[in-house]
Curated annotation (Swiss-Prot):
It comes from Klebsiella pneumoniae. This is Uncharacterized 65.4 kDa protein in cps region.
């Protein structure tokens, strides 16, 4: 019997079926990528090893512990079946061996140290858990995440290949090393990326919001907290952000091939930063932004490179330059918060090829039990690159007096190297009577008498005493009543004429006179200081200064001795005009 079906009837039956077909096909295909029912797809780590996966891409939820493992912690999560991989990659955290596949943890954008058993309670040892997590982060090329507020007690060293992974916390996490840790470093940052065209892989935050803690201020760990660079060629272009380091003899140590690295919002407490001599391919454009360096007579020692410090705080911390290092400090705060020793220097240039600049910054010397007898800045002899200081505000009390030290002058800059200071504002016990440079006076000529008495007017009661050794200063001797020494100079700016000189009076008296003249050679003001043997029986710094009139054109400075028996010695007469 033949069945007769009209064309219209056939199409009515066929079209709904065709419409439904792609929907069913799509649903079946999508099931390979998403979980159908978490409740029906739950396994323990033991049972999943016996389960036969239905297809590659099947998603299940795995919980429970691996009872046969020494490290029995397991962090539950979703896993997807993938083809079988090498045994050495099976870690029972990211990868689990299945019956006919490998189960891989479903990961969004990071590896969590908790997956590997890191507890972070400040008591249990999380060393190995973090090591395993770090290996997984490198293998997966994903960041390693730490839990905010947790304290991870550790004893291992860790290496972070920045081209593959990074460490971070969404807030602040702490890694605390055991007190008996004695390896060379706690963490090494480097990049294994050799391909120039792929160097962009380094452009990331290598460590963020992690405190790296050693021991206490009186028992620092001798290891280095973070070592950067090594034999790899391109450890560069990455950032360290919001990292606090304390309790280490060395907070940072730079090795070969470390360059173009930025530190921002970091805290370096009690320890030193070292860029040692001999490093290769290192030191180009190193940046510290809004960082703090503090306490324990710590220092930053740099032997090469270009180093930029912006909006930083240096508390009881010295920056030491050697080799051909260049340092640029701006908009920063430098402070001695209460040092108990007599030495305190902020920046010292200790080689003839180094250079430093300090601009738009503030220096504060708080009252201390000791008189600080070193200058705030130092430039070694024969350095022609020198020190440049501009827009500096300096505030101190009488506890700052380098004239009582080896510089024999109350100055901001010591040493005999080149320095240039512009727009320096000084508050020293509400007086601004100190000089800027030991090496030079911005007002007087031949102020240290290196050229004898050239540029000075004097009579026969004044003579130049021969130096006993090359280390001695040139000394002027007044030997009779009425002996005088003077110099007239033109001045081009107003402000405070500030300075002083070293003086010793065995007998007699000495009067110092400062006269100011306008452009018509009219005397505007006169200021005098009387010095006697009772106050200056031994070498001491005489402070003098005067607020200059607005219409000043010239000054004349006199030194004149009085008395029946005169034995007066002076050296290093320094004058600067400061704000």
């Amino acid at each position: 019997m033949k069945l007769h079906m009209s064309k219209t009837y056939f199409l009515k039956k066929l079209i709904p079926s065709l419409t439904l077909f792609p929907v069913l096909t799509s649903y079946a295909s999508s099931n390979k990528d998403v979980i159908e029912s978490p409740q029906s797809k739950r396994y323990t780590i033991e049972s999943i090893k016996q389960y036969i996966s239905l297809f590659i891409g099947e998603c299940v939820f795995i919980s429970g512990q691996e009872a046969t493992q020494d490290d029995s912690f397991f962090y539950s999560g979703y896993f997807v079946s993938i083809p079988v991989i090498a045994d050495e990659l099976i870690d029972n955290v990211i990868y689990i061996r299945g019956k006919n596949c490998t189960w891989k943890r479903k990961i969004d954008d990071f590896i969590d140290v908790s997956w590997f058993g890191a507890i972070g309670d400040g008591i249990n040892d999380d060393s190995n858990a973090i090591s395993r997590a770090n290996i997984a982060a490198h293998n997966e090329c994903l960041p390693l995440k730490f839990i905010p507020g947790h304290i991870y007690q550790v004893k291992n060293t860790y290496e972070i290949d920045v081209s593959k992974t990074s460490w971070f916390s969404s807030d602040l996490s702490t890694l605390k090393w055991f007190n008996d840790f004695n390896a060379d470093f706690a963490i090494r940052l480097f990049s294994s990326q050799k391909d120039y065209s792929k160097r962009f892989q380094n452009v990331k935050v290598a460590i963020k919001s992690i405190a790296i803690i050693g021991a206490g201020i009186k028992n620092l760990l001798d290891s280095c907290a973070i070592k950067i660079g090594g034999d790899e060629r391109n450890s560069s272009l990455f950032t360290i952000d919001s990292v606090s380091i304390q309790g280490w003899r060395t907070t940072l140590a730079f090795d070969n091939n470390s360059w173009r690295i930025k530190f921002c919002d970091c805290h370096f407490l009690w320890g030193n930063i070292i860029a040692p001599p001999g490093n290769k391919n290192s030191g180009e454009c190193m940046v510290f932004d809004n960082c703090m360096f503090a306490d324990n007579r710590s220092y930053t020692e740099l032997h090469y490179g270009d180093w930029f410090f912006s909006k930083c705080s240096f508390d009881n911390h010295e920056v030491k330059l050697f080799g051909d290092a260049n340092v640029f400090i701006n908009q920063s705060h430098m402070e001695n918060p209460g040092r108990k020793t007599t030495d305190f220097t902020i920046v010292s240039i200790n080689s003839i090829n180094s250079f430093a600049s300090v601009i738009d910054s503030f220096i504060f010397i708080s009252p201390t039990p000791k008189i600080i007898n070193t200058p705030l800045f130092y430039v070694i002899s024969d350095n022609e690159n020198g020190l440049y200081v501009r827009n500096l505000r300096f505030q101190a009390t009488e506890n700052y007096n380098p004239s009582k030290g080896t510089e024999n002058a109350l100055v901001l800059v010591g040493g005999d190297g080149k320095s240039y200071l512009e727009n320096v504002r000084v508050s020293l016990n509400n007086k601004s009577y100190l000089a800027l440079n030991k090496n030079d006076s911005s007002v007087l000529m031949n102020s240290r008498f290196k050229d004898g008495l050239r540029y000075w007017d004097f009579n026969d009661g004044v003579s130049l005493q021969a130096r006993i050794s090359s280390n001695d200063s040139e000394t002027i001797v007044f030997s009779k009543n009425g002996a005088s020494l003077s110099q007239s100079v033109l001045v081009k700016s107003t402000g405070i004429l500030s300075g002083g000189m070293m003086l010793k009076i065995v007998s007699g008296d000495l009067k110092l006179t400062l006269e100011c003249y306008d452009s018509l050679d009219n005397n505007i003001t006169t200021r005098e200081w009387n010095c006697s043997a009772s106050d200056y029986s031994d070498w001491s710094w005489v402070r003098f200064g005067e607020k200059l009139p607005d219409n000043i054109r010239k000054i004349k400075f006199y030194c004149k001795s009085f008395g029946q028996s005169v034995d007066v010695k002076l050296s290093t007469i320094l004058m600067d005009i400061i704000s």
